[in-house]
């Protein structure tokens, strides 16, 4: 197909033999926009057993990749305005704040954020998935219906 886009983007997928909520209770990640050819990804997940695991990746100009020290969760930012979905964030070297809520559903939030890390102020994309909430019967009953999205700029 003839596809093209402008701006930042990413591709992700989930694959496995069991439903995600059988293994994970949730996860959140933050991906910074590049500054001087450097971008960060902070990824934290929690298994249904309560075990937590994190990953920090630093991408550099020219395709370099370095694995960093996993960051614990920092103070959460404000929950989403409609469904009150939590938005935990990794404990970077400075405060994080919401710039704009892009997706606000009962179990999922996507937000544009301001993040301070390693002495730089980054604009970042943040995602949080709450699979405990996803598994609740009231949320399951809502799944056939599309959740409203905010208008794109």
PLM segments and residue spans:
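Structured soluble/peripheral alpha/beta segments that form catalytic or ligand/cofactor-binding pockets
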Residues: 1-153
């Amino acid at each position: 197909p003839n596809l093209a886009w402008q701006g930042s983007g990413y591709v992700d997928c989930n694959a496995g033999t069991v439903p995600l909520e059988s293994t994970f209770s949730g996860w959140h990640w933050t991906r910074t926009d590049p500054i001087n050819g450097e971008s960060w990804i902070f990824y934290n997940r929690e298994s249904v057993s309560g075990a937590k695991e994190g990953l920090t990746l630093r991408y550099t100009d020219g395709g370099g990749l370095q694995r960093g020290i996993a960051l614990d969760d920092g103070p959460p930012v404000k929950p989403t305005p409609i469904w009150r979905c939590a938005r935990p964030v990794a404990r970077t070297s400075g405060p994080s704040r919401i710039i704009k809520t892009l997706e606000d559903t009962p179990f999922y939030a996507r937000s544009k954020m301001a993040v301070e890390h390693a002495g730089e102020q980054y604009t970042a994309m943040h995602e949080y998935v709450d699979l405990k909430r996803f598994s609740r019967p009231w949320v399951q009953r809502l799944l056939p219906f599309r959740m409203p999205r905010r208008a794109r700029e």
